[in-house]
Amino acid sequence: MVVKTIRVRAYASIANLGPGFDVLALAIDSFYDEVELKVKKHEKTKILVESILGPYGTGIPKDEKNTAVAAAKEFLKRTSEKAYVSLRIWKGIPVGKGLGSSGATAAATVVGLYKVFKPNIDYNELIEIAAEGEKVAAGSPHPDNVSASILGGLALIYQRKPLRAIRLPISVKPKMILVIPEISTIKEKTKMARSLIPKQVPLEKVVHNLGRLAALISGFILGNLDLAGSGMFDDIIEPARKPLIPVYFRLKEKLLKMNVNGVCVCGAGPSILVMVKQNYKSCLLYTSDAADELD
């Protein structure tokens, strides 16, 4: 039987962007993961991680807790395929920093398998499969990050069951600064961050977030970064997670006074995104100085 080899790259992503909790994510080209798959059809299924390399490969499991392994199993199960799958993973996305690292690995894996087997499924199901794979790292499936890694650009999850996602057109390419704190990663960070979210939310806060989300999306589509940046505010999730990101609110206050377009937490944190449209070098220095002051 023929062994097929394919290598797939999946880029980092930033989920939520302020008010878009669990529905919005943006792919960025600052970091990426790569997965090389060697696939051979067989009577039995076996998935093996040969190696995990790259600057952020240390400590990543090779067993079923690896999102690539979990995603591959889910793909083969849904498509009723059986195969030997050998994986070589290159981790180029910082782990546990809110940049979609686990989701990118899962996304690259399912896209690779899709190109090998060419099953009759669409990208919505591919996103579902990758999200199921990410469950081993995050505790539950999160399609926002994987949708951005698979679709690219600005991805919107507009329906959950069945999952429906779309890549939104962006009329502008803003310059972005990432603040990545050099702190130890909390074990099961995403699960802990979700546990802080309130079960009940006042209607006023929901209305506020909906308005901000509309401004954020409209700004990107219309090419209006001031409008997009005005949408990067969240009255529900970010305040609830304040214990995990104590520096964020003080840093955001400082940066907004420097006329940056927008500031938000990347996913569950701790990384912070700063969006600017002009004076990029000055904003970069301001951001660095402000972060140092709060260190």
PLM features per residue range, with description:
Residues M258-C264:
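A short linear hydrophobic-aromatic micro-motif
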Residues Y123-M258, Q278-S282:
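ATP-dependent small-molecule kinase catalytic core of the GHMP/sugar-kinase superfamily
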Residues K44-K46, Y280-L285:
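Short, conserved charged micro-motifs
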Residues P143, V265-P270:
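Short Gly/Ser/Thr- and Asp/Glu-enriched loop/turn motifs at secondary-structure junctions
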Residues L273-K277:
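Short hydrophobic/aromatic beta-strand micro-patches
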